Amino acid sequence: MNTSTNSSAFAPLKNDTFLRACLRQATDYTPIWMMRQAGRFLPEYRATRAKAGSFMGLATNTDYATEVTLQPVERFPIDAAILFSDILTVPDAMGLGLSFALGEGPKFAHPVQDEAAVAKLAVPDMDKLRYVFDAVTSIRKALNGKVPLIGFSGSPWTLGCYMVEGAGSDDYRLVKTMLYSRPDLMHRILQINADSVAQYLNAQIEAGAQAVMIFDSWGGVLADGAFQEFSLAYTARVLAQLKREHNGARIPRIVFTKGGGMWLKEMGLLDCDVLGLDWTVNLAKARAIVGDSKALQGNMDPNVLFASPAQIAAEATRVLDSFGTPYAGEGTGPTHIFNLGHGISQHTPPEHVAALVQAVHEHSRKMRA
């Protein structure tokens, strides 16, 4: 499938702060974007979703996906946009029958719970995900060079959790039962997932994504040893297949494992440019463990955004200071991208997000003065 677009189809980038920080180059201030920044906390998102009629109606319609991706960029002076989509588009394209019931999470009509179901799994035809790649190109054009566009996917392990459980889970009983009793089946699922995710992200890059992120949302539920074997190894398998550059521009690769603080040393060896951290990790300690080969992204607790603007600014300052002095020289050095430690809550007051963005930009400029 050819999803490739020529870079001349897009306006030149006006704000490359995020991409420079990803590549460990000096910037005038610390860039900020937020996981789930296009979402229910914005009244304009809720209005567009009502028009679309459902979550998948939103995600599969190029115009709606473009509209909601741009909403936070138009409202706040953030430094990157992230594609509006869902991590479960890939298993849906495998024929698992994804649906979103109102007020409930995602569900699969055909979970992968036995040998026969695993035997039927294959890397999906990327044409089934054409709506995602069309959205990437549409968003990139609509951004008109304002900020870079991040593409993303779930990690092989996180997708596997949903595929085996058939939905979200509190205890991961079904997927862990398979992992321990039939590791051969679990590995087969993860191999197919890794190769699917690599093709999916490469197609997003060809369509116009300027960075890509792998969300390992459920890596942290694994035991030590199991994490390395069933999550980290397959994230590495994805990274090994990803395009390093497109149309002459480097494409940064970001990996975020929620609950991955235990394994920073191993994650520091991944072939990626940026490690995303949740709020349980101290940035200075992470920097010491990971070394200067990776930029760090994170990691304020999203619930700080329910405090007052003054308290939000104080906490943002603390997070920035905990990373330490950002790099200011030639070449490359330690850099930080400000983000939350997980997705923003749908109940967050938008004006509190505005206060956060302002505080991050102001304090991080002072740090470089």
UniProtKB/Swiss-Prot annotation:
It comes from the Bacteria. It holds the Pfam family URO-D. It is found in: Cytoplasm. InterPro entries: UROD/MetE-like_sf, Uroporphyrinogen_deCO2ase_HemE, Uroporphyrinogen_deCOase. GO terms for cellular component: cytosol. The record marks 86 as: Transition state stabilizer. Substrate binds at residues 36-40, 86, 162, 217, 342. The keyword Cytoplasm applies. Keywords: Cytoplasm, Decarboxylase, Lyase, Porphyrin biosynthesis. One of its GO terms (biological process) is protoporphyrinogen IX biosynthetic process from glutamate. Pathway: Porphyrin-containing compound metabolism; protoporphyrin-IX biosynthesis; coproporphyrinogen-III from 5-aminolevulinate: step 4/4. It is an enzyme of class 4 (lyase). Its main location: cytoplasm. GO terms for molecular function: uroporphyrinogen decarboxylase activity. Its EC number is 4.1.1.37. It catalyses: uroporphyrinogen III + 4 H(+) = coproporphyrinogen III + 4 CO2. HAMAP family: URO_D. Catalyzes the decarboxylation of four acetate groups of uroporphyrinogen-III to yield coproporphyrinogen-III. Belongs to the uroporphyrinogen decarboxylase family. Homodimer. This is Uroporphyrinogen decarboxylase. It comes from Albidiferax ferrireducens (strain ATCC BAA-621 / DSM 15236 / T118) (Rhodoferax ferrireducens).
